[in-house]
UniProtKB/Swiss-Prot annotation:
Catalyzed reactions: N(6)-[(R)-lipoyl]-L-lysyl-[glycine-cleavage complex H protein] + glycine + H(+) = N(6)-[(R)-S(8)-aminomethyldihydrolipoyl]-L-lysyl-[glycine-cleavage complex H protein] + CO2
Coiled-coil zones: none
Residues carrying N6-(pyridoxal phosphate)lysine: 698
Assembly and oligomerization: The glycine cleavage system is composed of four proteins: P, T, L and H.
Enzyme class: oxidoreductase
One Pfam short name: GcvP2_C
UniProt name for this protein: Glycine dehydrogenase (decarboxylating)
One example of a Gene Ontology biological process annotation: glycine decarboxylation via glycine cleavage system
E.C. designation(s): 1.4.4.2
Functional note: The glycine cleavage system catalyzes the degradation of glycine. The P protein binds the alpha-amino group of glycine through its pyridoxal phosphate cofactor; CO(2) is released and the remaining methylamine moiety is then transferred to the lipoamide cofactor of the H protein.
Keywords: Oxidoreductase, Pyridoxal phosphate
Any GO MF annotation of the entry: pyridoxal phosphate binding
Amino acid sequence: MKLSELFNPNEFAARHLSFGDEAALLAAVGEKSMDEFVGNTVPQSIRMPSELDLPDALTEADALAKLKGIASKNVINKSYIGLGYYPTRVPNVILRNVLENPGWYTAYTPYQAEIAQGRLEALLNFQQVCIDLTGFPVAGASLLDEATAAAEAMAMAHRVGKVKSERFFVDARVYPQTLDVMKTRAKYFGFELVVSDFAKADDGEYFGALFQYVGKDGDVQDLQDVIGRLKAKGTIVAVAADIMSLVLLKSPAELGADIALGNTQRFGVPMGFGGPHAAYFAFKDAFKRSAPGRIIGVSKDASGKPALRMALSTREQHIRREKATSNICTAQALLANLAGMYAVYHGPEGVKRIANRIHALASAFADALVSDGINVVHKVFFDTVTVDFGNKEKADQVFAAALESGYNLRRVNDTQVAAAFHETSACEDLVDLYRAFTGKDTFAFADDVKGRLNAELLRQDDILQHPVFNRYHTEHEMLRYLKKLEDRDLAMNRSMISLGSCTMKLNATAEMLPITWAEFSDIHPYAPEAQTAGYRELLADMENSLKSITGFDAISFQPNSGAQGEYSGMLAIRRYQEAQGEAQRNICLIPKSAHGTNPATAAMLGLKVVVVDTDEHGNVNIDDLKAKAEQHRDALSAIMITYPSTHGVYEEGIRDICRIVHENGGQVYMDGANLNAQIGIMQPAEVGADVLHMNLHKTFCIPHGGGGPGMGPIGLKAHLAPFAPGHALTDTHSASADQTAVAAAAFGSASILPITWMYLTMMGKQGMEQATRWALLNANYVAKRLSEDYPILYTGKNGRVAHECIVDLRPLKAESGITETDIAKRLMDYGFHAPTVSFPVAGTLMIEPTESESKAELDRFIAALKQIKQEVLKVGRGEWPKEDNPLVNAPHTASDVTGEWAHPYSREEAVFPLPFVREHKFWPSVNRVDDVYGDRNLVCSCPPMENYED
């Protein structure tokens, strides 16, 4: 035995990839070796000239140990900084059974509602929490963060408002990070932001206004009068409200506002150095068709039973494109589920107890300081006590004393210091903080504390009265409720999810473990830099790896979704061109096949979209591109292009595309949605891209979470790097200081970055290169096998696809009347989530198997589609009626096959169409959901409890 052969640092790659299947897969596609296969699939013209410059792989154990060492460099002080981020307690039953459970975090956005009823119910619970606390009848299923939500509220106010003005009022008490993001958005919408004292909001004419409730320094103001005066002028009013304070305070709707928004982080979601967290967004019913983001609605299924679905989806970017209400794609579904379940578990009395405890501790602390002669700035507050010492020296001394005792305070200005209380604050903290503020060791406080909120500010209505918030307060009940919901969903812990352009790959357990380590989860985004050395090292490691992979000169981690990455990349181009004196460049070329987020993003930046045709092979029409680039030469800003193409093909002309755009004065933005087909094979910067966004929740193993979180960092060439997003409160060490932000936190959803770090570290150079090759091989295997039954719409060199393929269902539809939707729903009966339906071509399925699926799983999926083809042919031959067959009736539930049966096909054909289905049957909990009924009768709050009964 050789010891060197018994240690295998590449062990993780063998868990991520199915090396034992290589020979069979290669033989099926007619190749002898992996090198030969790649050579016949990838154009030589794009191949990178050298190998990846990445470290060798580490084992799972060694990678975790190394990351633990990095994490230990973060300092966990008790955070009293506030500004929208607070320590909280994640109930352990929710931590283990939702956040750490692949049944929840590996699911995709619930487009296929019939196999997503569990998380749809959880998201409906979240919406109900937001509806109850804000007082509005409609709430969305989450936005990316509070700052983004505020910017979306501003845009929505302009869409729905009647005031003919381009001016928007911003309360001077809003969080600085919120104002930072609003400045970015306002510039390219052409809005003028007026930041002033809240009481002066009605001094001018504004199309909209935003107020902070509670203010950034802790004060709570009665906004009812000023809102009333603005409403009399027709101004649309938004209120950014602290979610925990709304447990006690009057709702924004009662104050007279039109929109409410904020962060739900305080409801059981760790701070995580800035995210991810679910923002809430609630509004008047009249605005529902203009709202950003997703809304979960109650509809009915084919049997008439209540069923949930995503409502009003025609607002979304993939349908409306440049006319969309926003470019949002990924939201924060997993975090919304955590926040909603926090309210379910604690119930109305539990959250009131927490809110009152926070307020009582802050009030007791303020009382003690006042009795000691210290100037507490605000008499009315919820959780934040701001003190003015009158001189800088004393403020410095107090701040340092608190730091020495392990407490982070907020420095408001030279003479003022603030302490923000929170769910984890304890009576011992009062003693420590009192000592830091006064220098005295003894602190006696009365058990009976008088609150600082005036009676006229307090809500009089009841909250969280729906039975779902009053039933699951014991751990056994909560555990079983979570399990019941999980069992209604099909996630990747059951079967592959082959969604094209979504890259649903393995989210390995070792990758997920570190996100709940306190060293990562308990860090405030604005903690002193000396306390975040571990995060800085993690970011530096990842920056080096991503630069090597992509060939870019700089990386910005701020964008907290793919759509935000797009926006940030195009924003850098716009800023660069303005700095060059070329602000007139406002034309954006976008291929016809592009992701819907592309035109929506371009429109948000004030760019005019010019569509470039594609040829019969699905590639960009070079002649049309050249003509349009030359036509708009003086105004050309950029092209937005996806590579490999959205049609799943390596376009051989990519270098020519980049050259033509550059020759005509434009920049090249590359959409990184398909980066999984590039790593180790090509570098986007080397073929001519100037900026690229990377979906860490696709290519780099962050799970999709049932609709978020995501991360969309951007890679930039040197000339664009100074124009990456900056931040008002944190040194990003990249962008120029004067560049405003795109997200509330400087490094986006930083606490999920360890997932990608672990993936990169455990795969190493060799593993990352192998992953791409396997992604190509699996896709071509699927395409080859399915081509025996279905046309493959687009292929490239040697009849090959890249990492995904498009199956054309239109001929079958013409012959039989069976639609792509029927086939998607029928796949549920076989235990599979459908591939991407009707994108980028109507009447098709786009399949992306990824590298981490075994041949056995691919064969099951292929067998399902082949059997479905035979079922369609039966309909076409008249053996089954067009109006009554297993496809149009799909999916079938357990209730269907145990009740009356009058169909021309058997129960077995309905639910056990192939032998493997019997081994691990997934039962959809509802029949096909009626989308039209749901949109015509929109209900986005929890239905009566009897609807939940089994």
